[in-house]
């Protein structure tokens, strides 16, 4: 949803691959967009320390966010124009590199909650308005449905089909005993620092 909504996707969500849990702890999503673009999303709780990386490639360069730094590699003109006018099969292209480092400490979910509280108290505009949340949820639901059916799923998903598949999984769900008797909030928070 950061670059628009895909028209369809196919996904594999592996349940209990690394942990004794009833939900996915590894997921791969391949998405296709109306404009011909594609997207790949990979996530896993089994990789430690793991990698938090966002990479967006376009016809005029790419943006990479990793370890608190945004790196832009920019072309002077569209790569399609460069390749169309070059006699070389894979022409060398000059790029301009711009790096922008994160100046403030990461606030993650706490920052979103503080922003929400500030919007209520002071009437400020939300950093992440609720209307935007439906896009991420729609992609997640489509990924689940695709993983369950092993098929491509068109977006927006068919809500009835999704709910029927979800009910099937709820009916076969078994209650599990807690793995730990302690609060793991600190452990969880530290492990998932993304440094965007």
Please tell me what each predicted stretch does.
Residues 11, 41, 65, 72-74, ...:
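Short hydrophobic/aromatic-rich beta-strand segments that constitute the beta-sheet cores
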Residues 21-22, 52, 67, 166:
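Short, well-ordered secondary-structure micro-motifs
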Residues 28, 33, 59-131, 153-196:
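C-terminal glycine/acidic-rich active-site capping loop/insertion
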Residues 50, 136:
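Short catalytic/ligand-binding loop motif for oxyanion handling, primarily in non-cytosolic enzymes
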Residues 52-53, 57-59, 140-142:
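Generic detector of contiguous secondary-structure segments
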């Amino acid at each position: 949803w950061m670059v628009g909504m895909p028209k369809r996707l196919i996904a594999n969500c592996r349940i209990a691959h690394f942990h004794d849990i009833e939900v996915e702890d590894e997921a791969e999503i391949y998405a296709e967009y109306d404009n011909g673009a594609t997207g790949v999303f990979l996530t896993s709780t089994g990789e430690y320390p793991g990698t938090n990386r966002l990479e967006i490639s376009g016809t005029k360069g790419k943006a990479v966010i990793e370890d608190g730094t945004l790196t832009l590699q920019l072309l002077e003109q569209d790569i399609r124009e460069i390749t169309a006018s070059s006699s070389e099969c894979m022409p060398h292209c000059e790029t301009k590199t711009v790096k922008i480092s994160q100046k403030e400490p990461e606030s993650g979910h706490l920052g979103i909650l503080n922003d929400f509280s500030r919007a209520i108290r002071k009437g400020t505009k939300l950093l992440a308005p609720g209307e935007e949340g439906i896009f991420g949820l729609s992609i997640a639901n489509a990924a689940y449905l695709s993983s369950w059916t092993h098929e491509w799923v068109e977006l927006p998903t068919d809500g009835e089909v999704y709910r029927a598949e979800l009910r099937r999984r709820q009916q076969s769900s078994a209650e599990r005993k807690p793995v730990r008797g302690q609060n793991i909030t600190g452990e969880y928070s530290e492990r998932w620092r993304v440094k965007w």
